């Protein structure tokens, strides 16, 4: 590989210090640079190990107000934008976002690539009404059935839609899985799993870890599905005893190394890691943190927002103060700091997503030019109608604003590279 006359270790040391946006620009300068950056597994692994996440948050039911807070930067006033179309964030994985902007969309904000996904062939997401109009048919409260997965080797993405089905036994639930590949082809997996009856926790997002999408159920067990191998399993685990003992807040999340569970009271925050998932699963307590941010008597609401193994995030709303506050705990420095704010009109239905910029994800699948007019044929019992879904300037401008806002994370992502 060309290294501009520099020894390879020194050249890589320079690349490791680049923020994600600068690294993407470097890939475009020479073909040999692009090959080394994109294809060398050692380089990708070491570079990503030094990239820090940021935080995206928006109303769980969709909003035109999107907020972004880079970890380690408390200048929150500039990390907010008004979108042109009501948007929901449904997932974040390996630098990609799964969005709902009048339809499903996968985007890599760093590379500015995106793709609107055709859901007309989905068994679980589409429905033709009596007028022959194709509609997206997933109620707001069931949006957590959708999960985003990115293959860590090929960097290709897949979207998984999980469907719950009742069985003849009222004490059992059967789960089905539909998979969307990058070419917008929906396929019903032959895999089903039947297990003890329980429901998903509505306000808990699915979590991607180690090739699989994981859903937390109300009985504490975890449903897992790998879209590559199409293997499904139920992890028979209960909530930690501390969660059952007192009324508190909790979060289901993942780090680079493990699935994680956070439970918090006004005094103490417990961090758990899942151990022995295949044999004897249990939540092992790995850290306790003093809750130093929810002591204010004027707080009307607070909760755990996000966790990635490096930062723990809490947010709180006050009774008499205009804006709420987003707090971050740096687990390496063992200290709290302010990440940003939340407007006073936000209620408890506010969703937070860790977002880590990645110059590697789905460069092929999202490199295609998006056709702004998608025509879908819908057939019913009486006629055939042509339905035109227009991706107009407002859809594109909404995406551009999301991408521009997440650019705020990139300069901070490598600011503490060692």
UniProtKB/Swiss-Prot annotation:
The lineage of its organism: Eukaryota, Viridiplantae, Streptophyta, Embryophyta, Tracheophyta. This is Putative F-box protein At1g20795. It comes from the Eukaryota. Residues 1-46 form the F-box domain. InterPro entries: F-box-assoc_interact_dom (IPR017451), F-box-like_dom_sf (IPR036047), F-box_dom (IPR001810), SCF_F-box_component (IPR050796). SUPFAM superfamilies: F-box domain.
């Amino acid at each position: 590989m060309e290294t501009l006359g520099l020894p390879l270790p020194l050249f890589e040391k320079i690349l490791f210090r680049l923020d994600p946006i600068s690294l993407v620009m470097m890939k475009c300068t020479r073909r040999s640079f692009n090959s080394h950056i994109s294809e060398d597994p050692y380089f990708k692994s070491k570079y990503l190990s030094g990239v820090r996440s940021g935080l995206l948050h928006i109303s769980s039911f969709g909003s035109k107000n999107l907020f972004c807070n880079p970890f380690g930067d408390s200048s929150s006033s500039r990390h907010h934008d008004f979108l042109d179309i009501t948007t929901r964030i449904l997932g974040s994985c390996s630098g990609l976002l799964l969005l709902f902007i009048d339809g499903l969309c996968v985007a890599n904000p760093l590379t500015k690539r995106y793709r609107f996904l055709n859901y007309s062939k989905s068994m679980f997401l589409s429905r033709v009404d009596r007028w022959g109009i194709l509609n997206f048919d997933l109620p707001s409260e069931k949006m957590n059935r959708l999960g985003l997965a990115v293959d860590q080797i090929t960097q290709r993405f897949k979207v998984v839609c999980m469907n719950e089905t009742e069985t003849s036994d009222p004490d059992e639930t059967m789960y089905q899985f539909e998979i969307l590949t990058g070419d917008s082809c929906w396929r019903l997996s032959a895999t089903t799993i039947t297990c003890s009856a329980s429901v998903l926790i509505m306000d808990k997002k699915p979590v991607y870890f180690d090739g699989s999408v994981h859903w937390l159920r109300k009985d504490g067990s975890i449903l897992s599905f790998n879209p590559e191998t199409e293997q499904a399993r139920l992890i028979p685990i209960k909530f930690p005893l501390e969660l059952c003992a007192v009324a508190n807040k909790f979060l289901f999340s993942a780090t680079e190394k493990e699935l994680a569970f956070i439970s918090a009271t006004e005094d103490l925050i417990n961090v758990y890691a899942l151990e022995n998932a295949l044999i004897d699963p249990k939540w092992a307590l790995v850290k306790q943190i003093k809750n130093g941010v929810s002591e204010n008597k004027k707080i009307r609401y607070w909760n755990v927002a996000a966790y990635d193994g490096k930062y723990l995030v809490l947010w709180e709303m006050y009774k008499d103060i205009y804006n709420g506050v987003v707090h971050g705990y740096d687990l390496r420095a063992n200290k709290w700091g302010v990440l940003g704010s939340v407007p006073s009109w936000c209620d408890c239905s506010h969703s937070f997503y860790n977002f880590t910029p990645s110059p590697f994800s789905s460069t092929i699948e999202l490199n295609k030019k998006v056709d702004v007019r998608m025509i879908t044929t819908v057939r019913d019992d009486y006629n055939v109608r042509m339905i035109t879904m227009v991706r107009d300037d407002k859809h594109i401008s909404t995406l551009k604003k999301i991408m521009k806002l997440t650019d705020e994370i990139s300069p901070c992502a490598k600011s503490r590279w060692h």
